């Protein structure tokens, strides 16, 4: 079978297995959407079939946009992850919540906005109403002690974005992400063509139309967006480069874990492969995306059914694995590089520290690769800060300094990396 036939078969099998009225999916490889397909019924009343351009509500995937907005303001120095919520929403004075814990779902605040929001589908429509509901919320767990998912926390983070940026959080997301990235089919309100949401009777194949939530008001940053799989794939490609959002905040079982959290992102483990993403659900809709940063392969899946989002998350993960098979990475050709900087003369080659051998090399940048059993780790990467002074910016000992020590003739005699001494030959550690 061709790559598209393989992916199409997988999608159609899962649609039948999960009894989804319709399902739409896309796959991205090396920054390009390489496959997309939609099957089923987008609108049961009219019998209209979906296309890859059909919008679906993506629910909590919206949180990844809100998290990216918070991180963008952090990068600009306008807020910090250790800031208390009250530093930006003064009405929250006395609250123990910090922005970082809210992003990672370990703030301990209750899950939902106080009230009957999921019974009456009535959400706080104004910032004042949201802040008033926040004051009624219960601190159900001690901050930082347990993972506890909270839509309320992300609604409050949206208010932080609004106050810090000086405009609505929705406008900030549009200006910073949707328009620059060309996510033309991602919007806060439904834009036709769009699917209708359904509940599938568990004991028959009858569809029931779900109540529509047109606008969730001040809670929108927690789950309002509509989108398409192709747009979500482009979004995942963008997020893959935002290193700070991938820092794991909670890890209960380091050996056997299969699901963890970064800052606004879910982390999935399948065998030795780690993928990031997020899922989402609103009445009548489920959605998920998953992305392998190492291989630059990702997938997004949306459907119009009220059923656990785990089903479409499994489809997305399966599509990524299938994409790795049918769209293998192209081998990167070797090309000669420019001469290394003169300062690095005498640095490149093999060095030893405490019985461990490292190769320092130039690959358009200074790198250090451990030899022997430790070679499986990523190379350390250095950037020059001053003459004979480098900062480790990636890999082993990230953040630590590397100094070049020279002899009286000006030749590099030894290195000091993270205060450890490196010599050209193995030497016994000495206090002299």
Where are these regions (language model features)?
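Short, surface-exposed loop or secondary-structure junction motifs
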Residues: 32, 39, 43, 95-283, ...
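Short, glycine/proline-biased beta-turn/loop segments that scaffold the active-site neighborhood
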Residues: 81-94, 181
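Short, well-ordered beta-strand elements
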Residues: 288-291, 295-305, 413-417
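A short acidic/small-residue loop/turn micro-motif
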Residues: 41-44, 306-308, 420-421
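Short loop/turn microsegments at loop-to-beta-strand junctions
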Residues: 21-23, 56, 168, 286-287, ...
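Peripheral terminal and inter-domain segments
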Residues: 310, 314-432
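Short, conserved catalytic-motif segment at the N-terminal edge
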Residues: 2-58, 78-83, 87, 135-137
């Amino acid at each position: 079978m061709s790559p598209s036939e393989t992916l199409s078969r997988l999608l159609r099998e899962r649609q039948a297995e999960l009894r989804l009225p319709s399902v739409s999916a896309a796959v991205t490889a090396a920054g390009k959407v390489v496959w997309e397909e939609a099957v089923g019924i987008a609108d049961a009343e009219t019998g209209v079939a979906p296309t890859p351009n059909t919008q679906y509500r993506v629910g909590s995937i919206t949180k990844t946009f809100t998290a990216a907005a918070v991180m963008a303001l952090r990068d600009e120095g306008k807020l910090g992850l250790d800031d208390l919520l009250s530093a930006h929403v003064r009405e929250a004075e006395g609250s123990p919540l910090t922005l970082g814990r809210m992003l990672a779902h370990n703030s301990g605040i209750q899950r939902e906005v106080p009230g009957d929001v999921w019974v009456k589908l009535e959400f706080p429509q104004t910032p004042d109403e949201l802040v008033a509901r926040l004051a009624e919320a219960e601190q159900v767990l001690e901050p930082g002690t347990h993972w506890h998912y909270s839509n309320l926390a992300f609604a409050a983070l949206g208010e932080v974005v609004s106050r810090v940026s000086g405009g609505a959080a929705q406008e900030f997301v549009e200006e910073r992400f949707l328009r620059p990235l060309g996510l033309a089919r991602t919007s806060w309100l439904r834009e036709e063509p769009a699917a209708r949401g359904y509940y599938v009777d568990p004991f028959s194949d009858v569809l029931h139309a779900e109540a529509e939530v047109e606008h969730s008001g001040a809670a929108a940053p927690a789950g309002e967006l509509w989108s398409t799989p192709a747009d979500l794939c482009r979004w995942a490609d963008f997020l893959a480069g935002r290193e700070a959002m991938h820092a794991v905040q909670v890890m209960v079982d380091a050996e056997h874990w299969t699901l963890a959290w970064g800052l606004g992102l879910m982390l999935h483990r399948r065998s030795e492969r780690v993928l990031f993403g997020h899922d989402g659900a609103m009445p009548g809709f489920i959605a998920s995306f998953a992305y392998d940063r190492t291989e630059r392969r990702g997938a997004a899946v949306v459907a119009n059914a009220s059923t656990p989002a785990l089903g479409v998350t499994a489809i997305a993960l399966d599509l990524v694995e299938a994409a790795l098979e049918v769209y293998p990475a192209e081998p990167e050709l070797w090309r000669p590089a420019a001469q290394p900087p003169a300062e690095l003369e005498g640095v490149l080659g093999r060095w030893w520290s405490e019985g461990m051998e490292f190769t320092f090399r130039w690959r358009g940048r200074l790198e250090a690769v451990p030899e022997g059993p430790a070679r499986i780790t990523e190379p350390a990467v250095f950037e020059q800060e001053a003459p004979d002074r480098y900062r480790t910016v990636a890999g082993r000992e990230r953040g630590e300094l590397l100094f070049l020590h020279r002899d009286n003739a000006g030749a590099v005699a030894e290195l000091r990396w993270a205060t450890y001494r490196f010599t050209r030959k193995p030497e016994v550690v000495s206090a002299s």
